[in-house]
């Protein structure tokens, strides 16, 4: 599994980028919203990747942040949505906008995505409504999201899944018990989980 590539931009296109990693050029498929944010030719880049293994070929897909990579992987679990459809979603809207549309069952927003009709929009809502932990973050204030994301990533490193810790994090955040120090927040989350298990 290729988790990321770190190198220099060799060539940029609206739908792909070639990255020079120690003299080896990797072609990485991207969504169109990513293109304007790419570094220029010869500049350094670190890109998070997903490797898709098909019958006759390997395809790399690249993202500048983990949120977009997570959404891409999640979309691949929806019936009838392949890599092309997942890239179409990310080309059309940011992850938070998509999650908000799923959470509010907003078909009108979803059918703006190229290739997504009413039935596909309904299928996305049905299949993702209960299994995407990020939906609970939709109503979180924008300035709080980096803190919560950092906390969740730290807990993932400790071996906890997002779905396992997100309810406790959201409860603590709702009650304004979380501070700005990640280590202290981890202790609060683990304490809350321990109390929950004793109930």
UniProtKB/Swiss-Prot annotation:
Region annotation Domain III: where it falls in the sequence: 148-199
Region (Domain II): 65-143
Any one GO molecular function term: four-way junction helicase activity
Spans annotated as Flexible linker: 144-148
Keywords: Cytoplasm, DNA damage, DNA recombination, DNA repair, DNA-binding
Domain I: annotated segments: 1-64
Signal peptide per UniProt: none
A GO biological-process term: DNA recombination
InterPro entries, per database record: DNA_helicase_Holl-junc_RuvA_I, Hlx-hairpin-Hlx_DNA-bd_motif, NA-bd_OB-fold, RuvA, RuvA_2-like, RuvA_C
Subcellular location field: Cytoplasm
A GO CC annotation given for this chain: Holliday junction resolvase complex
Function: The RuvA-RuvB-RuvC complex processes Holliday junction (HJ) DNA during genetic recombination and DNA repair, while the RuvA-RuvB complex plays an important role in the rescue of blocked DNA replication forks via replication fork reversal (RFR). RuvA specifically binds to HJ cruciform DNA, conferring on it an open structure. The RuvB hexamer acts as an ATP-dependent pump, pulling dsDNA into and through the RuvAB complex. HJ branch migration allows RuvC to scan DNA until it finds its consensus sequence, where it cleaves and resolves the cruciform DNA.
Domain notes per entry: Has three domains with a flexible linker between the domains II and III and assumes an 'L' shape. Domain III is highly mobile and contacts RuvB.
Family: Belongs to the RuvA family.
Subunit structure: Homotetramer. Forms an RuvA(8)-RuvB(12)-Holliday junction (HJ) complex. HJ DNA is sandwiched between 2 RuvA tetramers; dsDNA enters through RuvA and exits via RuvB. An RuvB hexamer assembles on each DNA strand where it exits the tetramer. Each RuvB hexamer is contacted by two RuvA subunits (via domain III) on 2 adjacent RuvB subunits; this complex drives branch migration. In the full resolvosome a probable DNA-RuvA(4)-RuvB(12)-RuvC(2) complex forms which resolves the HJ.
NCBIfam families the record matches: ruvA (TIGR00084)
The name this protein goes by in its record: Holliday junction branch migration complex subunit RuvA
């Amino acid at each position: 599994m290729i988790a990321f590539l770190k190198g220099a931009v060799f060539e940029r296109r609206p739908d792909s980028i070639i990255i020079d990693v120690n003299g080896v050029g990797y072609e990485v498929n991207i969504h169109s919203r990513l293109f304007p944010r790419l570094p220029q030719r010869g500049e350094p880049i670190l890109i998070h990747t997903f490797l898709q293994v098909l019958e006759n070929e390997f395809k790399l897909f690249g993202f500048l942040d983990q949120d977009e990579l997570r959404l891409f992987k999640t979309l691949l679990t929806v019936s009838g949505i392949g890599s092309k459809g997942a890239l179409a979603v990310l080309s059309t809207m940011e992850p938070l906008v998509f999650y908000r549309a799923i959470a509010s069952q907003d078909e009108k927003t979803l059918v703006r995505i190229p290739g997504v009709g009413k039935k596909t929009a309904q299928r996305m809502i049905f299949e993702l409504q209960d299994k995407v932990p990020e939906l609970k973050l939709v109503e979180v204030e924008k300035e709080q999201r980096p803190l919560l994301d950092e906390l969740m990533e730290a807990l993932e490193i400790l071996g906890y899944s997002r779905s396992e810790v997100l309810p406790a994090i959201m409860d603590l955040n709702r009650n304004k018990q979380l501070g700005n120090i990640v280590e202290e927040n981890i202790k609060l989350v683990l304490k809350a989980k321990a109390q929950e298990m004793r109930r």
